[in-house]
Amino acid sequence: MTLPLTIAAEAPGLAQRLGKTLATLPLSYRAQEKGASASVMLIAGDGDWAARATTAIDAGARGVIIADPGMTGADAILTLADRAEQAGAVVELAERYAGDPTLLRHHADLIQHLAATSTILMSQVGDFATPADAALDMVRTAHALGQPLTLTHMWQASHAVVVRGTAGEKLFEGMATSGSGGVGQRIDALGFGRTLRLALRGDGSASPSDLRIANAKGERKLSPVYESVDRAAWLRAHAALDRGEPDGQPLRQFAADVAMIQAL
């Protein structure tokens, strides 16, 4: 049975973003009526977002969507994971790159092909609050691709953040550049006789990203998914609430990624 859910944005600044997504969601999602409490809250992923999400759950929210989650206290994220599981609440991360619907659709296929590569290069263009936030975006994409990434170096050059590390036996290098033109994230995974080229849009639209796999037989473009990151997160939250299966493990992995970057 599909549960009817009322949804609301944490702050007026998110209302437009929520409204655009609500228009594409199933009718079981309804906008919050004046004076009524919301079943699911959309919370901005800046500042102390984990603490605010915990407060929302304490106030009775059955689900929370975090929009573009960034750096915050790792301990606060772990507290949120524990509280969500205790309350039976669902927390979904709407991540601009790691949550890309086309990437997630082809997750298993990409992991299989990445096993034959030895180097992962990542470049990112867009605004970021801090160098650590830029590094976090890249780390999260690597983990979304099933890569056990460990960063060893991070430094800031002119208008850019550079990170280096390893993903198992693979070498990893990423660079994030601040800018408004050509926003997105590009991943090139190189190996003997095999190449992956992924171009993730990261603009919040339903326009699909471009994912391609090349080997000795030629290049293959993976089928696109015409869906926004936000809509995909809302649908995952709804499905998890229907199943009654809250899972704090994704939050614990996010906390581990944050802690790794903070330790550099």
Each model region followed by its residue ranges:
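Short, aromatic/basic amphipathic alpha-helical patches
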Residues: G13-L25, I77-R83, A108, A135-V139
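Rossmann-like dinucleotide-binding domain that binds NAD(P)(H)
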Residues: I120-G193
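A contiguous active-site-proximal alpha/beta segment in oxidoreductase catalytic domains
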Residues: P4-A8, A36, A61-I65, G70-F128
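C-terminal helix-rich "cap/oligomerization" subdomain common to oxidoreductases
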Residues: M1-A9, G19-T24, A36-G63, L78-A81, ...
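A general structural signal for well-ordered alpha-helical segments in protein cores
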Residues: A15, I77, L103-L104, M138-V139, ...
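Structural alpha-beta junctions
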Residues: K20-R30, A59-G63, R83-E92, A115, ...
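NAD(P)-dinucleotide binding in Rossmann-like oxidoreductases
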Residues: F172-L235, A239, E245, Q249
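Hydrophobic alpha-helical segments that drive targeting, anchoring, or assembly
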Residues: V40-A53, I65-T72, T141, V183, ...
